[in-house]
């Protein structure tokens, strides 16, 4: 079956002779939810930039649903929607106007554009703010607006760069549910993230890139079998004088409003939230610490769990 994305011998060398990509090969199947992970400077942003025609490759072949991004640029572009990490829209425009204008770049008639804009703004909880100046929106709302903008031409491949960075727990999970929904409807999704839990919750397959080389390409299920634990930092509303005692969850009080907890393989962070709520301790934000990607990656290298030859697991 023709993949949604096919990358063959992709190389990128910048003018200063820095070799960002060293001949990577990667296929993403139609309908997949795929994570591309790597330490800062590993090459994932360059890879995403080439896929989205924002960076010019030095060598190699990239096809999107069979369309060569060089020889058939216009067709390939129609298949891709991009959600960058940074807010890159005119924040003095209104959300509805932003979406309708974006649709126009793809030749979509204004009446159809408005129908789609309403659909996505409603689905993403932004319809009531459709006529407000975008700079008045919260960071989470702006991120949802960028997702709506990426979807307005109804691409078959959605690429998200750190889609929930800086987003609170409740909003993050609602965004996860929306992304799962559009993936279930057939949209292929590729995301980069530093949150192991995010990749675990959303993605079926994963590639790890480092120093311009794919060092691991496997299923999420196979990768998780190799991990021991993840450490989370929890910010809580209440001021604490000591660490809560939760059976099976080693927890340290970092300061009055901050806890550090180890979650072992097979355990669920949601269980911690439930138990803390039972103690009238309310988590307002969460971030991964010990197994944020850089540390996870180097831990895997130390344990010889990464196939440095770039081989693919079939599990």
Q: In which residue ranges do the predicted regions lie?
A:
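ABC transporter nucleotide-binding domain
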Residues: 176-264
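Hydrophobic anchor residue at the start of the ABC signature
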Residues: 147
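A short, proline-enriched helix->beta-strand linker immediately N-terminal to the Walker B motif
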Residues: 152-156
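Conserved ABC transporter NBD signature motif
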Residues: 60-71, 75-76
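Conserved ABC ATPase "signature" region
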Residues: 100, 104, 111-129
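Catalytic Walker B motif of ABC-type/P-loop ATPase nucleotide-binding domains
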Residues: 158-161
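Conserved ABC ATPase signature
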Residues: 133-137
